[in-house]
Amino acid sequence: MGQKINPYGFRLGITTDWKSRWYADKQYADYVKEDVAIRRLLSTGLERAGIADVEIERTRDRVRVDIHTARPGIVIGRRGTEADRIRADLEKLTGKQVQLNILEVRNPESQAQLVAQGVAEQLSNRVAFRRAMRKAIQSAMRQPNVKGIRVQCSGRLGGAEMSRSEFYREGRVPLHTLRADIGYGLYEAKTTFGRIGVKVWIYKGDVVGGKRELAAAAPAGAERPRRERPSGTRPRRSGASGTTATGTEAGRAAASADESTAAGQPAEAAPAAEPQSTES
């Protein structure tokens, strides 16, 4: 069901790609366990870096790790000291040479994982959950590539005795459409009265033929094509109202008179209007 399943895994191979790319026969379970350890290491040690995604690719003697972050300066550190420390920890964990690539996220407001992390940080700082959710929705909807967003918080909201779930949605979020490009993020906020889970879904349009489908709507201020008229003529106006008179009986008579005069023929008089009487 599209409402329950993870949107990323539901569209795997259709609109999304694998985040771990390698092949193994007998070492498959060991590599999966190692990938989980790598992601856990990067998520626990770099909370303030704003990591949106981690991609892992393996060869026979090398492991390549791509870190997509909104704050690359925190991951790199002063003179690259933090990046060297991360690389050393990963080499100690994997036992192989590690190639570390740090990539900057251009629009963090349109990344579901970063939006969820931002809402969770506000909840940890005692910000009202409804205010944090609405602020995140407003920031995301300002982005041109975002067509819909849904933010959900679950837990002891506002310190209530009984836990509950609340969500806000703006725009379209078609969870059951396989061609829809939907980002999903999950983060937990640690508060004094327990943990609050934050989930974010962001819809960025449909993917058709490997390309994102954009709305081809014309801008509001675009000019409409004008109809050209013969040179030397002017549109006829009726009185001071500014409306063209060709649609009235007098206007049609005047237009036929002008055509007859231009052709050298006498113009026919317009028929007199018949008086209308109302019976009492």
Swiss-Prot record:
Binds the lower part of the 30S subunit head. Binds mRNA in the 70S ribosome, positioning it for translation. GO terms for biological process: translation. SMART domains: KH. Residues 38-106 form the KH type-2 domain. The keyword NAD does not apply. The lineage of its organism: Bacteria, Bacillati, Actinomycetota, Actinomycetes, Mycobacteriales. Belongs to the universal ribosomal protein uS3 family. It comes from Mycolicibacterium paratuberculosis (strain ATCC BAA-968 / K-10) (Mycobacterium paratuberculosis). Keywords: Ribonucleoprotein, Ribosomal protein, RNA-binding, rRNA-binding. One of its GO terms (molecular function) is structural constituent of ribosome. GO terms for cellular component: cytosolic small ribosomal subunit. Residues 215-280 are annotated as: Disordered. The gene is rpsC. This is Small ribosomal subunit protein uS3. PANTHER family: 30S/40S RIBOSOMAL PROTEIN S3, SMALL RIBOSOMAL SUBUNIT PROTEIN US3C. InterPro entries: KH_dom, KH_dom-like_a/b, KH_dom_type_2, KH_sf_prok-type, Ribosomal_S3_C_sf, Ribosomal_uS3_bac-typ, Ribosomal_uS3_C. Part of the 30S ribosomal subunit. Forms a tight complex with proteins S10 and S14. The keyword rRNA-binding applies. It holds the Pfam family Ribosomal_S3_C. Residues 238-280 have a biased composition (Low complexity). Coiled coil: none annotated.
